[in-house]
Structure formats: C-alpha cells, structure tokens
C-alpha cells in the first residue's frame, strides 16, 4: 500500500494494513492479488452470515430500489414494520425502538439515555472494551485506538476486565475471580466523584 492510497483517509483505530481488499464472499476476503484470507474480523454481519450472502444482497437491493434514505423527521413503512416486529419480541416495558446505524451510534444513544434517566454523568466500562469511536462511546473504549485524540469525555471509569488466563489474581493454578472483581469495584469507588 502506498501513501498516495491513504493520503485522503483518516485512521480511526489502528494503522491500516498493507493488504488492500478487493472482494469478499462467505467467510473469505480476497486482496488485489487474488490471495484468499479467512475473515474473522469484519464485524457481526459478515462474521455470522458471511460476505455477499445472496438473501441479504437481494433484500438490500430491493430496499434501495424503493427507498434508500429519508430525513430523520420522516418515517417509512420499513422503519415502522421493523420497530413493531422488534417491540413485539420484547417485554412490555421495552416497547419503543430507536433505529440507528452502528454500534457506536447505539452506544452513544444508550449513554445519553442513561445520563438523562439518572441525572448523573459517570459510567463504568471494562478496561479491555470496544464501544465505538464517537465521543462518549470512544471515551468508554479502552485500547490503543483511543490514543492521539485528546482528552476523553469526563466521568468514564475503568473496571478491570476479568482475565482468567493471565490474571494477577491467579495463584497455584487457581483463579480468584471474586477477589479480582472486588478489587475492580474498589478501583471504581476510588475513581468516582459520586455521580455514578
């Protein structure tokens, strides 16, 4: 990959791979040279259903041919039907839907709703988490991808992620998850300003 290929693209997580992907089908992606690579990383839709799944392609094609986008102040039949079908599967108290496009966008909305409902601003996130790249969701993401973007949103507290494989709370082959969890919540108690 040359610098001319990336000169107009911001990175938002780690540095780009030198491999340029040209196509994908099922669980396989192909680079420009035709090399096939098993894809275990491209996200929930591709991982579970595969790239270019024929039924999904047909459904998307059909939907785009009729209506591809409207302003958020308008409703469309697919949005109404989806919202009704989803709410029918949920408990009565969860009868309203907020359709969003990405996981980061969904996490951002969830953070705002939690803050609105509680009147507080602190949240707790696992220290090995990925929640997205938007302001709040990115602040609750704890990995190398958050470097270089300045200060995160205030009030995000880190809870150590349980780690049985290499836990500092393992001795003689025994994993003391309760001690690890207690220590983690003690760390949260030390970080909070009382707005949790």
Can you say where each PLM-predicted feature lies in the sequence?
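PLP-dependent aspartate aminotransferase-fold enzymes
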Residues: 85-195
